[in-house]
């Protein structure tokens, strides 16, 4: 395990306060005043807009607060029952390759899901992690349905990463209906509990910790 500092934040973390704290931590990491960090938390129900968000993808603008996140990507939902991992790593030291970093985040999610015998997969042109749903009716094209279980969106400031990923453990999946998640209309969303797995947040956190160093060796 590297010297990354891990924190599990209790309760529901207010979005703007958390973003400000994250930006301060990124500056401290860049200045050499603080170690790299991973924060595990939950937010109250809200939508965030990434730098590629399209107005038409905010279907219900009055349903929950909407925050401009400044990260890459489009609209996503955060709320109770979803584990958010904010990942603040020094890519100046680990390698200045944004694409590789995003792939490493996907690898981390895939390895974490495998701890629960869930096969997470990448899809070209669709950042995030997906699961095939043979238990559901095929899509309009006759192909097996695929649902998104994890979203990824990052930003770099002087080669220190922030924002990160979210994994759906047991959120209210109907809350995603207020947006077009990540701008993708033809696929749905799922969660570990929706897949029939009695996983707790503590189980998920332990799996994230166990698998982290495989994707982010020191």
From Swiss-Prot:
It comes from the Bacteria. Substrate binds at residues 71-78, 151-153, 164-166. The active site is at residue 182. GO terms for cellular component: cytoplasm. It is found in: Cytoplasm. The record marks 148 as: Lowers pKa of active site Cys. GO terms for molecular function: lipoyl(octanoyl) transferase activity. It is an enzyme of class 2 (transferase). It catalyses: octanoyl-[ACP] + L-lysyl-[protein] = N(6)-octanoyl-L-lysyl-[protein] + holo-[ACP] + H(+). Its EC number is 2.3.1.181. Residues 32-218 form the BPL/LPL catalytic domain. GO terms for biological process: protein modification process. Its main location: cytoplasm. CDD domains: LipB (cd16444). Pathway: Protein modification; protein lipoylation via endogenous pathway; protein N(6)-(lipoyl)lysine from octanoyl-[acyl-carrier-protein]: step 1/2. Catalyzes the transfer of endogenously produced octanoic acid from octanoyl-acyl-carrier-protein onto the lipoyl domains of lipoate-dependent enzymes. Lipoyl-ACP can also act as a substrate although octanoyl-ACP is likely to be the physiological substrate. In the reaction, the free carboxyl group of octanoic acid is attached via an amide linkage to the epsilon-amino group of a specific lysine residue of lipoyl domains of lipoate-dependent enzymes. Belongs to the LipB family. This is Octanoyltransferase. It comes from Cereibacter sphaeroides (strain ATCC 17025 / ATH 2.4.3).
